């Protein structure tokens, strides 16, 4: 599993909330890349600051389970969406990036 934080802004003084949802799927050699993503997870919807183009950072999400049983030498695809049914910002939210949190099995990458 992974968790994430979303970094976003809005060109608006609206103080509504924004909800970002992350889902993932792993694909191995000879797997179809038209695979279904796992269940999307969203951190608590974050209110925009009310100042146009301010940086807004969400809280860390709950665990996002990656579909496809990820393993060594597999590629992972992520899908991030805005869930407007769970937020209240009436302006366009602009996703700037995400911070992805994950645990590795090795102390180094050697």
Predicted regions and their residues:
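Extracellular Ig-like/FN3 beta-sandwich strand-entry sites
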Residues: 1, 17, 71-75
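Solvent-exposed strand-to-loop "edge" motifs in beta-rich extracellular domains
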Residues: 5-11, 25, 103
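Beta-strand-rich interaction surfaces with strong enrichment in secreted/lumenal proteins
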Residues: 9, 43-51, 63-67
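Extended, low-complexity, turn-rich repeat/linker tracts enriched in Gly/Pro/Ser/Thr and Asp/Glu
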Residues: 9-17, 28-30, 86-89
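Cysteine-clustered segments with highest specificity for TGF-beta superfamily mature ligands
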Residues: 55-86
């Amino acid at each position: 599993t992974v968790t994430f934080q979303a970094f976003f802004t809005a060109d608006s003084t609206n103080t509504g909330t924004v909800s970002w949802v992350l889902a993932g799927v792993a694909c191995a050699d000879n797997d179809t890349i038209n695979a279904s993503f796992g269940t999307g997870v969203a951190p608590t919807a974050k209110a925009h600051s009310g100042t146009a183009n301010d940086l807004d950072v969400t809280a860390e999400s709950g665990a996002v389970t990656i579909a496809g049983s990820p393993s060594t030498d597999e590629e992972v695809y992520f899908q991030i969406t805005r869930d407007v049914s769970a937020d209240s910002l009436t302006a366009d939210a602009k996703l700037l990036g995400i911070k992805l949190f994950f645990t590795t099995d090795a102390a180094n990458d050697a």
